[in-house]
Design a protein with these regions (language model features):
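Hydrophobic alpha-helical transmembrane segments
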Residues: 57, 128, 132, 190-191, ...
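N-terminal targeting leaders of membrane proteins
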Residues: 5-13, 17-119, 130-131, 148, ...
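Mid-length scaffold segments of soluble, non-membrane domains
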Residues: 129-153
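Juxtamembrane helix-break-helix junctions at the cytosolic face
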Residues: 115-122, 180-183
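N-terminal secretory signal peptides that target proteins for export/translocation
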Residues: 1-2
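Membrane-embedded catalytic cores of phosphoryl/pyrophosphoryl-handling enzymes
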Residues: 146, 151, 155-235
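Lipid-exposed faces of alpha-helical membrane segments in multi-pass integral membrane proteins
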Residues: 62-66, 102-112, 133, 137, ...
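Extracellular loop and loop/strand-boundary signature of outer-membrane beta-barrel proteins
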Residues: 92-94, 122-130, 157-160, 205-207
Length: 235
């Protein structure tokens, strides 16, 4: 993948993970001086910080959705969409269908990890219901917004560009993975979000979405992914 496309993926991943990264802190230094090894899976959440982490994460997600909506009418943001498209397409030598499969990768990974003995927060039935709720909210919201906004795709194929459904699906799956394994290791969530950000970058590489579509889809996916867990927790 070209440098510009990778840079966009990195920006998306950093923005989406800002709340998660700020909620992680290492244990106090209570080990003996002779201890030289450290397991990253043992990172713990600071209670004072983790209390505010969901609010911070949802604020970041809401900001991404708001950016997507603003770009529908704001000329400077539309111009940024066009310049980003031009830069990416200048180096796009081929199209790929990897994004059609990568959008599901974090969710598939959750079930694969459980199958090999790396247990998440919920059993098969509960996590399936949680993910089902998230997907239902995400899919319904995405279809509704596409029909209401009628933003033309960069390739001119139709008027269903905003928000990116692939990106929303990928980030909902990434948030699902993060929530399932946040008490095991933060690196599972980071991997899920990296896959989601790559999905968004590939949608632009394939000339199917504007940058603002990707930002809006990412924010929507994070929000609906988290909503599935919140809905189940209240039952």
């Amino acid at each position: 993948m070209k440098l510009h496309c990778l840079s966009v993926a990195a920006c998306l991943c950093v923005s989406a993970l800002r709340g998660q990264a700020q909620s992680l802190t290492a244990r106090p230094d209570t080990v003996q001086p002779t201890t030289v090894h450290y397991h990253f899976s043992q990172l713990k959440l600071n209670p004072d910080v983790s209390y505010h982490a969901p609010r911070l994460r949802m604020s970041v997600a809401a900001g991404m959705v708001a950016y997507g909506f603003a770009a529908l009418t704001a000329h400077p943001l539309k111009q940024l969409n066009r310049s980003t498209k031009a830069e990416i397409q200048e180096h796009a030598d081929y199209t790929t269908t990897i994004d059609n499969h990568l959008q599901w990768a974090p969710a598939v990974a959750v079930y694969a990890l459980n199958a090999v003995g790396v247990k998440g927060a919920h059993n098969f039935q509960d996590r399936s219901i949680i993910y089902g709720i998230s997907c239902a909210i995400m899919a319904g919201s995405t279809r509704f917004l596409k029909k209401v906004t009628r933003e033309q795709r960069p390739d001119g194929s139709n008027y269903l560009s905003f928000p990116s459904g692939h990106t929303a699906t990928a980030f909902a799956a990434a948030e699902f993975m993060r929530m399932e394994y946040k008490d095991v290791s933060p690196w599972y969530g980071l991997a899920g979000y990296a896959a989601a950000a790559t999905t968004g970058a590939l949608r632009m590489y394939n000339n199917r979405h504007w940058f603002s579509d990707i930002a809006g889809g990412a924010g929507l996916g994070i929000t609906t992914g988290y909503s599935g867990f919140r809905s189940w927790r209240r039952k």
